[in-house]
């Protein structure tokens, strides 16, 4: 059974996290553990962007960004999926350079060293050469860089619909099943 870590950096794009968590709860039969790490800045951004910060409604284990006693700080805990959404370029840089100075970068390091699924949903734009090289390094190490770029062939009508095109893709990349629009065959 899947054990999932959702990490929330301080980048703008809290709606992506909210939609992901809502969808993960809707497919609970596909996972046995959901653990969430939210940085202090992510809490502020969430409140600013969404007007709320009630994370307690999600059936999950919550960890502070410096809690290195979290089970997924060790590879022996067998967490097999980590989604960082949104993933700031600062977080990308720390992961790419092996700096395990907080729980998010430590967990990502563990996921990569154990050859498990790391998905970094980057939202910032444009990219400079340092960003591109850091994303390349993570990709070469086995991670997946998934820009938060909505698709429009499904004709989304709302921001939430557009966000769902990205989130559904992330869920699919994680190896989980979700009903979503796909290109007609």
State what each model feature region is.
Residues 1-119, 123-185:
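A cross-family phosphate/adenosyl-ligand binding-site feature
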């Amino acid at each position: 059974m899947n054990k999932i870590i959702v990490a929330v950096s301080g980048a703008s794009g809290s709606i992506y996290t909210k939609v992901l968590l809502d969808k993960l709860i809707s497919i609970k039969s596909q996972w046995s553990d959901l653990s969430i790490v939210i940085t202090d800045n992510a809490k502020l951004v969430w409140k600013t962007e969404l007007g709320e910060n009630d994370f307690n409604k999600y059936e999950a284990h919550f960890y502070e960004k410096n809690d290195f006693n979290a089970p997924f700080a060790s590879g022996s805990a067998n967490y097999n999926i980590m989604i960082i959404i949104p993933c700031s370029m600062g977080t990308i840089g720390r992961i790419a350079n092996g700096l395990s100075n907080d729980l998010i970068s430590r967990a990502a390091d563990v996921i990569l060293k154990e050859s498990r699924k790391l998905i970094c949903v980057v939202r910032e734009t444009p990219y400079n050469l340092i960003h591109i090289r850091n994303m390349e390094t993570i990709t070469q190490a086995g991670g997946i860089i998934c820009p938060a770029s909505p698709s429009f062939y499904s004709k989304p009508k709302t921001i939430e619909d557009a966000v769902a095109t990205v989130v559904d893709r992330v869920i699919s990349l994680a190896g989980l099943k979700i009903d979503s629009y796909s290109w007609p065959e």
